[in-house]
UniProtKB/Swiss-Prot annotation:
GO terms for cellular component: cytoplasm. InterPro entries: aa-tRNA-synth_II (IPR006195), aa-tRNA-synth_II/BPL/LPL (IPR045864), Anticodon-bd (IPR004154), Anticodon-bd_dom_sf (IPR036621), His-tRNA-ligase (IPR015807), HisRS-like_core (IPR041715), HisRS/HisZ (IPR004516). Disulfide bonds: none annotated. This is Histidine--tRNA ligase. The gene is hisS. It comes from Prochlorococcus marinus (strain MIT 9313). SUPFAM superfamilies: Class II aaRS ABD-related, Class II aaRS and biotin synthetases. The keyword Nucleotide-binding applies. It comes from the Bacteria. It is found in: Cytoplasm. It catalyses: tRNA(His) + L-histidine + ATP = L-histidyl-tRNA(His) + AMP + diphosphate + H(+). Its main location: cytoplasm. Keywords: Aminoacyl-tRNA synthetase, ATP-binding, Cytoplasm, Ligase, Nucleotide-binding, Protein biosynthesis.
Length: 436
C-alpha cells in the first residue's frame, strides 16, 4: 500500500520545531500584551466575496492563488489567504467599531496556491496586528515600532525598514495614468507578466523581481512625485516620529503592497541573512477597507509576518532562546499604565515615553486618538489600567508628566488619590513608582 504523504506545500511541524515556534509566539504575545492589544480569532473559511471585495479582484492573490470551492449549500467559499479582511469583517459583524478604537492581534494558518520554496508554503502561518479606528500619522509610527521592537527582541539580524507613501486614492489614480503612459511607450521591453498587469494592476509592476524590469523602472516616474501636498506632509510626520523613536529607515519610492486596500504609509522590514534581501514583515495603512466591506469610513493600520521565513532567519542567526523568552511572560493582561496626551508636542513626547516604558517591561496603552482629555480618561478607565500618565503641551515643555492612580486610592494609609508630577526623562524611577 502506498504511504500517504502531506500535500505539496502543506508542511508538518514536528515537536522540536513546534517548541521553537511556541517560543516566538510567547515573545510576540508578551509584546502585544504590553502594547494593550487584544487577541482575535477568525474562521479559516470565509465567503469568497470577502476577499474579492477586500483584497481586490485584479490582485494575484484573488486571481491566481486562492483555494476556492462551492460548498453543498451552493456558496462560494475560500480558505483565507490573509488575515486583515477577516478581522475587519468580524469587527463589523459584532459591532466592535462602535465601541471606539480597537487594537487586535491574530495568529494562524493562511492558504495560497503558489510555488512552494524555502520560507514560503501553500499553508503558511502568519502573526499580525490591526489597529482600527485610529488615523493619525503617529499611530503609523507606533504600529511600525511594535513590529521593529518585536523582531529586534527575537534576535533577527540584518534588519532594514523601508517605507513609502501610497497617498490617497486620487493620488494613486493620477500616478496610475502617468505610469501606464510611461510603460506603454516601452511596452516592447516588458515581460509577459508585466504586460498582463499593465491595464489590470500596473502598480504591481513596480514590485517585479525580473532583473530587466527592475532596471527599466529605475527611470520610471515615482508615486511620491504624484502625491498631494497633504499626503507629503502626512508622510513627513511619520518620518519625524520614527526618528523620535530612533528607528532607522530608508525611503523606497518603488515599494508597493500586493493588496488593493493599502494607501498612505506602506512599509516592509527586510533582512539579508538568507542571502538575498527577504521581506520579514510588511503592512501599512488601509483606511478604505472597512467602508469597502460595508462599514462606515474608518482609519486602519496593520502588518503581518510569516512564521516560516522568520524561523529560517532565526535559525540562520542561531538566536532562538525559548527559556529566556518564556521567563518574561506575565499572566495579567491589565495595562500598568495608560498614556493620556493632547497637543502636537505632547503627542510626540507621549509616543516616545510609551515606547521606552514598554521596553522597560511595563504594559502601556497609548491613546493616539487626539481626543479631548475627558474622553481619553474614560478610555483609560475602561482599559482597567492601574495608572494614567497625563501629558499636555505644558507638561511636555517642562519634561514632566502627571501620574494619576486610577484604581481605588482612598485608603486609611492614603486618604487622598495619588496625583503627582514626574520627570519624563527618569524612566527607571517611573517604572519603579508604577510597580510599587
Amino acid at each position: 500500500m502506498t504511504q500517504l504523504q502531506s500535500l505539496r506545500g502543506m508542511v508538518d511541524l514536528l515537536p522540536e520545531q513546534t517548541r521553537c515556534w511556541q517560543a516566538v509566539e510567547s515573545v510576540a504575545r508578551d509584546h502585544f500584551r504590553r502594547a494593550g492589544l487584544q487577541e482575535i480569532r477568525t474562521p479559516l473559511l470565509e465567503v469568497t466575496e470577502l476577499f474579492a471585495r477586500g483584497i481586490g479582484e485584479a490582485t494575484d492573490v484573488v486571481g491566481k492563488e486562492m483555494y476556492t470551492f462551492v460548498d453543498r449549500g451552493d456558496r462560494s467559499c475560500t480558505l483565507r489567504p490573509e488575515g486583515t479582511a477577516s478581522v475587519v469583517r468580524a469587527a463589523l459583524q459584532h459591532g466592535l467599531l462602535s465601541q471606539g478604537p480597537q487594537r487586535f492581534w491574530y495568529g494562524g494558518p493562511m492558504f495560497r496556491y503558489e510555488r512552494p520554496q524555502a520560507g514560503r508554503q501553500r499553508q503558511f502561518y502568519q502573526i499580525g496586528v490591526e489597529y482600527l479606528g485610529v488615523g493619525s500619522p503617529r499611530s503609523d509610527a507606533e504600529v511600525i515600532a511594535l513590529a521593529w521592537a518585536l523582531l529586534v527582541d527575537l534576535g533577527v539580524q540584518g534588519l532594514v525598514l523601508e517605507i513609502n507613501s501610497l497617498g490617497t486614492l486620487q493620488d494613486r489614480q493620477k500616478y496610475r495614468e502617468e505610469l501606464v503612459a510611461w510603460l506603454e511607450a516601452r511596452s516592447e521591453e516588458l515581460d509577459d507578466d508585466s504586460r498582463k498587469r499593465l491595464y489590470t494592476n500596473p502598480l504591481r509592476i513596480l514590485d517585479s523581481k525580473h532583473p530587466a524590469i527592475k532596471e527599466l523602472l529605475q527611470d520610471a516616474p515615482t508615486l511620491f512625485e504624484a502625491l498631494s501636498v497633504e499626503s507629503k506632509a502626512r508622510f513627513e510626520e511619520v518620518q519625524v516620529d520614527l526618528e523620535a523613536l530612533q528607528i532607522p529607515f530608508q525611503l523606497n519610492p518603488r515599494l508597493v503592497r500586493g493588496l488593493d486596500y493599502y494607501g498612505h504609509t506602506a512599509f516592509e522590514i527586510t533582512s539579508d541573512q538568507l542571502g538575498a534581501q527577504a521581506t520579514v514583515c510588511g503592512g501599512g495603512r488601509y483606511d478604505g477597507l472597512v467602508e469597502q466591506l460595508g462599514g462606515a469610513p474608518t482609519p486602519a493600520f496593520g502588518w503581518a509576518f510569516g512564521m516560516e521565513r522568520l524561523m529560517l532567519l532565526l535559525e540562520a542567526a542561531a538566536s532562538i532562546n525559548p527559556s529566556g523568552s518564556a521567563a518574561r511572560l506575565r499572566a495579567s493582561t491589565r495595562p500598568d499604565l495608560y498614556v493620556v496626551n493632547r497637543g502636537e508636542q505632547a503627542e510626540r513626547v507621549a509616543l516616545v515615553i510609551a515606547h521606552q516604558l514598554r521596553a522597560a517591561g511595563l504594559v502601556v496603552e497609548l491613546d493616539s486618538s487626539g481626543a479631548a482629555f475627558n474622553k481619553q480618561f474614560k478610555r483609560a478607565g475602561r482599559s482597567r489600567a492601574t495608572w494614567a500618565l497625563v501629558i499636555g503641551d505644558d507638561e511636555a515643555e517642562r519634561g514632566e508628566g502627571r501620574l494619576k492612580y486610577l484604581q481605588e486610592a482612598k485608603t486609611q494609609a492614603n486618604p487622598t488619590p495619588i496625583d503627582k508630577l514626574h520627570r519624563l526623562d527618569d524612566v527607571t524611577g517611573l517604572v519603579c513608582l508604577v510597580r510599587e
